[in-house]
Amino acid sequence: MMTLLQSACASVLMTCMPAAGPQDGMALSKLIYTDIDTGFTQASLADVIDLISQTSGAKVVLLAESESRPNGIDASLTVDLPAAHRPALNLLQDALAACGSPVPCTWQVRSGMIEVSTKDQLSTESMQVTRILPIEEFIQPIPDYNDPPNLNLGGGGGGGTGGGAGGGDGAAWEDLETRRNQLIEVLISNIEPKAWKRAGGNWAEIMPYRRSLLIRGPRWVQRQVMGFDFLLPRVSGRTPRTLRFDGDQVRVEIALSEQLRREDNERAAQPH
């Protein structure tokens, strides 16, 4: 059986270059730039997902629990949310947070679709990809400027002893392996701690390779480490929106100018 390192190195061109096509960016962009102002009372999660899909025009697929998919999400879970003007992506995540699922659930972009289900279902072997994270800039040793080398620049005249360039005892530099392992610990401690095989999980694996890290895992984990592997298209005539990553949540933030413009339009539309 091929190890993760052998598999990743053998297929480096296929797995490490962006594999996602433009359809992935287009699908997510529809959820970012479509606003939905709807509240829900005891609405099934399936109905909420269907509304988001129809309103945004994106293909949002609920991978529900079934005989062939025992780890899928329970489509009959209900959602209670007050009406609020929010991007469709935020509504999707708010609905997942409000549905009361007994197991963690999330979403990911794959093959031009937004897939919604439990984290377990979205982490099956067929859902996983391998990506390489360059870490050169993170593991460069930082000089100790409080203990500079003695250049012996003082004194003058012939017959001096000359300037040595002593660099201290050499213990100020940590070796590459130590710094790399420290970075791995930081990653698995802060990004989905229960996902990593190193920590007893089953969803993601991370291992060093020279001055990079090989990470194999589902897309919803990969985006927390390296972001999306596709570009988000600009929407003509729209103020650009930003994304804020907060764990497995990706929140859409609307510029203040756009919010004020919408409020002005709403006031103008009210009868006087």
Where does each model-flagged region fall?
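Bacterial N-terminal signal peptides
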Residues: 1-15
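Outer membrane pore-forming secretion/assembly proteins and partners of Gram-negative envelopes
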Residues: 9, 16, 20-272
